[in-house]
A protein has these predicted regions:
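Glycine-anchored helix-breaking recognition loops at helix->coil/strand junctions
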Residues: 44-48, 74, 111, 119
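Fold-independent oxyanion-binding glycine-rich loops
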Residues: 2-5, 20-23, 61-63, 68, ...
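Flexible, small-/acidic-enriched active-site or ligand-binding loops
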Residues: 26-62
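Active-site-proximal, glycine-rich beta->alpha crossover segments in alpha/beta enzymes
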Residues: 82
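Alpha-helical interface subdomain recognition
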Residues: 57-59, 63, 78, 86-231
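A short core secondary-structure module
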Residues: 1-38
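Cytochrome P450 core scaffold surrounding the K-helix E-X-X-R motif
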Residues: 29, 69-75
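Solvent-exposed alpha-helices and their adjacent loops that cap or buttress functional pockets
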Residues: 8-12, 48-52, 75-76, 199
Length: 231
């Protein structure tokens, strides 16, 4: 996303999207020099979780991008902001789906551990407190999954823009809670890096931040549409 019009008074209407090509690479940083002297460099931003997918700091130094790389061709000039915004709803429903998958993995591991770990002569799955926790976790997981399916159907019909934000708000916060309780069922082993649930716990934290922080979604999307529809 770059400014393609020198007139700064245009604001976001002066932004366009371009495809930038580079070769594939291994590792967490790269340099891509151009024959005419331009240089693109990138370095992965270290994070506490979600290590299978990285965000990068990118630096463009006299890097040339051909005009034919403009997304939308000539009609796409000045439409970069609109193209970006158009993808947000899809990103939010798929983030809710990610949260559901993460919850499923955490629940399965908590259930398996509860059936295997013995405390005071009994597996912890036999204790009522553990049973209550497992039931609540499954209820939360099921609610998030069915909510996601319902919103996905709305979006298939061309609707559900606000609902995409709602399901992200619910599912991502639910994933944080569920993974916390799944880790708690594991006890001290849940805090060990060798335990998969520790990774799920850390990964869940970022879900309510990317694809629209929950505070922004609540104020700028959900509340705004609710107020407009009620007036």
């Amino acid at each position: 996303l770059a400014r393609s019009n020198k007139d700064s008074s245009l604001g976001y209407k002066g932004l366009s999207l371009f495809l930038v090509e580079k070769p594939s690479f291994s590792g967490h940083d790269f340099k891509h020099p151009q024959t005419d002297g331009g240089l693109l460099t990138g370095k992965a931003i270290a994070t506490i979780g979600y290590r299978g997918m990285h965000s990068y700091d990118l630096f463009f130094e006299d890097f040339l991008v051909p005009a034919e790389n403009l997304v939308g061709e000539e009609a796409g000039e000045g439409k970069g902001f609109y193209f970006t915004m158009a993808g947000f709803a899809g990103g939010r429903i798929q983030t809710a789906a990610r949260a559901t998958g993460l919850m499923q993995a955490a629940f399965e591991r908590a259930l398996s551990y509860a059936k295997d770990r013995k405390v005071f002569g009994s597996i912890i799955a036999d204790y009522q407190l553990t049973q209550i926790k497992l039931a609540r976790l499954l209820a939360t997981l099921t609610a998030a999954r069915q909510f996601s399916y319902a919103v996905a159907e709305l979006m298939d019909d061309g609707a559900g823009q606000m609902e995409a934000s709602l399901v992200k708000l619910f599912s991502c916060r639910a994933a944080e809670m569920l993974c916390r309780e799944a880790l708690q069922i594991h006890g001290g082993m849940g805090y060990a890096e060798e335990s998969a649930v520790s990774r799920l716990f850390v990964d869940a934290r970022v879900l309510s931040i990317f694809e629209g922080a929950e505070e922004v979604l609540a104020i700028k999307v959900v509340a705004r549409e609710l107020i407009e529809e009620s007036s």
